[in-house]
């Protein structure tokens, strides 16, 4: 009878923890936005990484037309 509870995995964390450890890992994959907002569909990439490049190109492209 003592083996049954252990085999159930309810008292033991190995079986239960192993299955619960997988879900948290999936959350980490969705939480990468904070890790690297560069490839975030939230627009974070356009806020820091994309912002600098476009801003420089925009400033250089704008001056030419006004000059004419």
Curated annotation (Swiss-Prot):
Residues 1-68 are annotated as: Disordered. Changing residue 28 to A: No effect on interaction with EDC4. The keyword Kinase does not apply. Keywords: Cytoplasm, mRNA processing. The record marks 30, 34 as: Required for interaction with EDC4. Pfam families: NoBody. Transmembrane segments: none annotated. It is found in: Cytoplasm, P-body. InterPro entries: NoBody. It comes from the Eukaryota. Changing residue 22 to A: No effect on interaction with EDC4. Promotes dispersal of P-body components and is likely to play a role in the mRNA decapping process. Interacts with mRNA decapping proteins DCP1A, DCP2 and EDC4. This is Negative regulator of P-body association. It comes from Homo sapiens.
């Amino acid at each position: 009878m003592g083996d049954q509870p252990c085999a159930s995995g309810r008292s033991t964390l190995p079986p239960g923890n192993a299955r619960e450890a997988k879900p948290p890992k999936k959350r980490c994959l969705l939480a990468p936005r904070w890790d690297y907002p560069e490839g975030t569909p939230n627009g974070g990439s356009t806020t820091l990484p994309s912002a600098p490049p476009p801003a420089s190109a925009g400033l250089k492209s704008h001056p030419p037309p006004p000059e004419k």
